[in-house]
A protein has these predicted regions:
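Bacterial N-terminal signal peptides
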Residues: 5-14
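Short, low-complexity N-terminal intrinsically disordered segments enriched in polar/charged residues
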Residues: 17-56
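A solvent-exposed, acidic/Ser-Thr-rich amphipathic alpha-helical stretch
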Residues: 24, 54-107
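Hydrophobic pocket/interface hotspot
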Residues: 53, 61, 82, 113, ...
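Short, cysteine-centered beta-strand-loop-beta hairpins and adjacent loop/turn segments enriched
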Residues: 91-95, 119-131
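Short, surface-exposed coil-to-beta transition loops
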Residues: 96-99, 131-137
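Short beta-strand edge/turn micro-motifs at domain boundaries
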Residues: 110, 133-155
Length: 155
């Protein structure tokens, strides 16, 4: 009976420790994504910050930002399109703050980050003042260690 009890304890502790193990590479990628994404939104952001963020992405990355961008198709020039779009808004904020609330790692294929952010600035297209505070969930699909799909959801 002692041996069965001991075996049961060993099995439970093994399963418990395996359930708690999280892919350290994806954990690091999640933090790097958040840090570089936040850096691109800073008032003093430059192409250096933008390129550090883009370096995490596949060349054919898909970017879906609901409800504004509903297409999540991966295109051969996905990264180039993101570079163009993000360059247009680069430096538009006069204030930007973000706070990471939760990070979720799903096996080796996905990351979800939930965060709040507050931004203030001038919209570069219409020169109107903007200010907003939101809670966002970014869901990232991972392929060969890079981010292949970004989906942004607003709370």
């Amino acid at each position: 009976m002692k041996h069965l009890y001991f075996l049961a304890i060993c099995l439970l502790s093994t399963f418990s420790s395996q359930a708690k193990q999280v892919n350290p590479e994806l954990t690091a990628l999640a933090q790097q994504y958040f840090n570089t994404m936040v850096a691109t939104q800073a008032p003093n952001a430059t192409n250096k910050e933008l390129e550090a963020f883009l370096a995490l992405l596949t060349d054919d990355v898909a970017n879906q930002h609901l409800p504004y961008q509903t297409d999540d198709s991966r295109e051969p020039d996905g990264k180039a399109m993101m570079r163009k779009g993000m360059t247009f808004y680069l430096g538009a904020h006069t204030e930007y703050q973000a706070n990471l609330l939760d990070t979720f790692i799903f096996n080796d294929s996905a990351i979800a980050l939930r965060y709040t952010h507050h931004a203030k600035g001038i919209h570069p297209q219409n020169q109107q003042e903007i200010e907003y505070t939101q809670t966002i969930m970014d869901v990232l699909e991972i392929e060969d260690g890079n981010i292949a799909v970004i989906r942004k959801y607003h709370e």
